[in-house]
Design a protein with these regions (language model features):
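Flexible glycine/acidic-rich beta-alpha junction loops that bind and position SAM and/or redox cofactors
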Residues: 15-18, 107-115, 185, 209-221, ...
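Aromatic/hydrophobic pocket-lining residues that form the small-molecule binding cavity
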Residues: 27, 56, 84-91, 125-132, ...
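Active-site groove signature of glycoside hydrolases
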Residues: 99-118, 142-151, 253-254
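A short acidic, glycine-rich active-site loop
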Residues: 19-20, 121-128, 224-233
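Acidic/histidine-rich catalytic cores of soluble enzymes
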Residues: 41-42, 71, 133-233, 279
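Acidic-and-aromatic substrate-binding clefts and catalytic sites of carbohydrate-active enzymes
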Residues: 14, 21-23, 44-56, 77-86, ...
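Residues at the N-termini of beta-strands
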Residues: 41, 102, 203, 250-251
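N-terminal pre-domain/capping segments
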Residues: 1-102, 122, 133, 140, ...
């Protein structure tokens, strides 16, 4: 089997309004545009549950209308463990109901006004480990894989954070989503991280990084240095090669938090790059 190419469509929804009908219209537009560009698989944030919770079949039918598969929903955990687990289980249930297979998740941030990058805080990471272990086990009963995403500005970001989290989570239930841009911001070679985590990788996020802009950025501005594929310095052919070495045949999901022109234009640039540089 070959790797599958996906795109995140939450960026359509944050510009289209959060009232239910506007959100649904934006989601449908993302399906239509991404299918036109050649993306057969789609990811979104778990907040879309708010608009379809009473009728998941409506979202199943929308996927069929455009012949796309919404394979992943993305959740965020703060440090209230019981609340995070309760919310996570509801999101996993909804994901399973619409046919999704992967549940991406991350810490939602430190919850204070302190710096965005900090030494490993074992107390904070332990909370993420406990939440992930419980939800990962639950997800398996629903046919879903939990994939934790190390992310800038959170308690699981650096190499030390990742090592601690990996050592304290169940490898049979808790997997990883490696993000090529966030690892680059952490000073981690994404190729090396792929090889390190190996079979624990169940999902991939592809983003490029403009390191010149990064050198001029501080704090949260660093995430404004992400680019469409091919417009930065990430060696995606090497990333693909490392994934092939570990036998990965899952999803390569392109994400761009802040498109320069529009979601469609950025998605088109990345899709052309994937075809030309990666042969997918």
């Amino acid at each position: 089997m070959s790797m599958k190419v996906a795109y995140t469509s939450w960026t359509w929804m944050i510009t289209g309004g959060r009232d239910p009908q506007s959100a649904k219209n934006a989601l449908e537009a993302s399906f239509r545009e991404l299918k036109h560009l050649g993306y057969d698989y789609i990811e979104n944030f778990a907040f879309i549950q708010d608009f379809y919770a009473d009728n998941p079949q409506e979202l199943v039918d929308l996927q069929a209308k455009y012949d796309v598969k919404l394979v992943n929903l993305y959740g965020h955990f703060m440090f209230d463990e019981s609340a995070a687990i309760e919310t996570g289980k509801k999101q996993i249930d909804f994901l399973a109901a619409i046919g999704g297979k992967w549940y991406n998740c991350q810490n939602g941030g430190f919850g204070d006004e302190g710096p965005s990058e900090r030494p490993t805080n074992s107390t904070m990471v332990d909370a993420m480990c406990r939440i992930s272990n419980e939800l990962g086990k639950y997800a398996q009963t629903k046919g879903v894989k939990l994939c934790f995403h190390p992310h800038y500005g959170t308690c699981v970001f650096s190499q030390g954070d990742i090592d601690y989290f990996a050592a304290n989570t169940d490898p049979g239930n808790v997997f990883f989503c490696v993000d090529t841009a966030h690892s680059t911001l952490a000073g981690i070679d994404p190729v090396a991280l792929v090889k390190q985590l190996g079979k624990r990788i169940e999902y991939m996020h592809l983003k490029d990084v403009d390191t010149y802009a990064l050198s001029k950025s501080e704090g949260p501005e660093k995430m404004g240095t992400f680019r469409a594929l091919g417009l930065g310095v990430v060696n995606f052919p090497a990333v693909k090669g490392a994934l092939e070495e570990i036998g990965y045949d899952g999803v390569l999901c392109v994400e761009l938090d802040r498109p320069v022109i529009s979601n469609y234009v950025s998605a088109e640039i990345s899709r052309k790059y994937i075809k030309l540089a990666l042969g997918l």
